[in-house]
Amino acid sequence: MRRSEVLADESITCLQKALTHLREIWELIGIPEEQRLQRTEVVKKHIKDLLDRMIAEEESLRERLLKSISICQKELSTLCSELQVKPFQEEKDTTILQLEKDLRTQVELMRKQKKERKQELKLLQEQEQELRDILCMPPCDVDSTSVPTLEELKLFRQRVATLRETKESRREEFVNIKKQIILCMEELEHSPDTSFERDVVCEDESAFCLSLENIATLQKLLKQLEMKKSQNEAECEGLRTQIRELWDRLQIPEEEREPVEAIMTGSKTKIRNALKLEVDRLEELKMQNIKQVIEKIRVELAQFWDQCFYSQEQRQAFAPYYSEDYTENLLHLHDAEIVRLRNYYDVHKELFQGVQKWEESWKLFLEFERKASDPGRFTNRGGNLLKEEKERAKLQKTLPKLEEELKARIEQWEQEHSTAFVVNGQKFMEYVTEQWELHRLEKERAKQERQLKNKKQTEAEMLYGSTPRTPSKRPGQTPKKSGKMNTTTMSSATPNSSIRPVFGGSVYRSPMSRLPPSGSKSVVTSLCSGKKTPRAAQLRANKENLDLNGSILSGGYPGSTPLQHNCSIKSVASTYSEFSRELSKASRSDATSRILNSTNIQS
């Protein structure tokens, strides 16, 4: 049983006790029955009125709760629709009081969310409007009466963040451009003369409208100032170049140049004006010394002609170069020509430098070719032969590669400019081919001259006998060394010893290596001793005919056999080659005209 029911039973019991007590009092007093009935009616009426009032109050409470539930349900439905959230789900089997409490709590929560969203929307709108005012952007139409959704608030926050980033980037760009504009104006000595320039330079940075149009105008203004500054710098640099050229042409001494050095840097207006005054002064001085100036220009013209590989016809095409009528008009013609040539060289500088590199490599190649045909190169003592051979091999690889690179670059240039690139009056590759052909013809001519010379020499030897050929003078011997040499060389004849023939002249044996007799140990001892004999010095010189990998260079003699301790007897390569050639020619001649006298010296 509920406690309320127990209390109700107790109330009934209490009422019964009270009525019983009243009847007892009335009985003791002696109140008649009619008055007792009246008094009981009064008690009943009081109790009934009290209970009726209590019931009415409770009924009113129930009505209020039901009304509140209805109101909360309607408001909650509206709030869910505005906030775009799911409708509130009421719990089943709940009392009116609990339902009203739940609905009222949910309504308060929804109201709070609505208020927060509208407050955030208002704050974001204010921030956006402020940023749009700074960026000079039109306002964004947003219904401030409606409740924004969470997604709308998220997009709004992102939009405001984007505007803030745009503002910061434009502000930074504006500050940087402003600094550059101020520097350019100071360099140009230019004061702001328009309202926009004054807004940029003089007004507060925060008051400047950071619109795209203003930023574009700023960039345009900066470009104009930079272009003007570049023009001033180029003009000043041109004036300085002109001054230096005039100094050199007029041979102005250093003590006169020093006062002008102060204006040789910078591009401000006062410096530019000072440079113009100096140029005017030098031009006037140039007209007073026109002949010397023209001669100086002609020297420069000749240098540019050489650098541009002008042919003789191209040089002669500039007729004023050969005129001796030194007038102002002639000077102007020379000035115009030197400017044209300088520009022409600057435009094609890379190609001309490449051709110059090829020319230098070609001259070096011809020098190596000349040295290769010189027999005296084998007598060097500094190891230059090996170094030259390495450089020559390297040059033989790099020269064709350089020609191919230049050919590709020149072909590309000719396609771009629709004209031929000429060197000394002809196309570069034709020029290269001509140089190679001239080199081949020169080698052929030298070969024919050698053959003719050898033929004449052979005929002379057939008639008069051979003459000794000594490619290099043997160094003198000291008395001490000559004594030792006599003890060895006189005991046995060396293969290279010369013998006087019967008919006059000298006849040489074939150079070869011969081991000494087993009993002649003194030969090996003298050749391989620690002391440097002239013969040993010649042996060391002949070792330079060998390459690092053991191969024989041109003119070398591969047939020698090394003795003990690498001591060998070699003849000079050019002497042996001439000897073998003469011997082979003599063997084919008539027997009567090729008698070779020989005398054997017994050891």
From Swiss-Prot:
InterPro entries: MAP65_Ase1_PRC1
Polar residues bias: start-end ranges: 484-499, 589-603
Gene Ontology molecular-function annotations: microtubule binding
Keyword Transmembrane helix on entry: no
Gene3D superfamilies in the cross-refs: 1.20.58.1520
Post-translational modification: Phosphorylation by CDK1 in early mitosis holds PRC1 in an inactive monomeric state, during the metaphase to anaphase transition, PRC1 is dephosphorylated, promoting interaction with KIF4A, which then translocates PRC1 along mitotic spindles to the plus ends of antiparallel interdigitating microtubules. Dephosphorylation also promotes MT-bundling activity by allowing dimerization. Phosphorylation by CDK1 prevents PLK1-binding: upon degradation of CDK1 at anaphase and dephosphorylation, it is then phosphorylated by PLK1, leading to cytokinesis.
Region (Dimerization): 1-341
Residue segments, region Unstructured, Arg/Lys rich: 467-603
Protein name: Protein regulator of cytokinesis 1
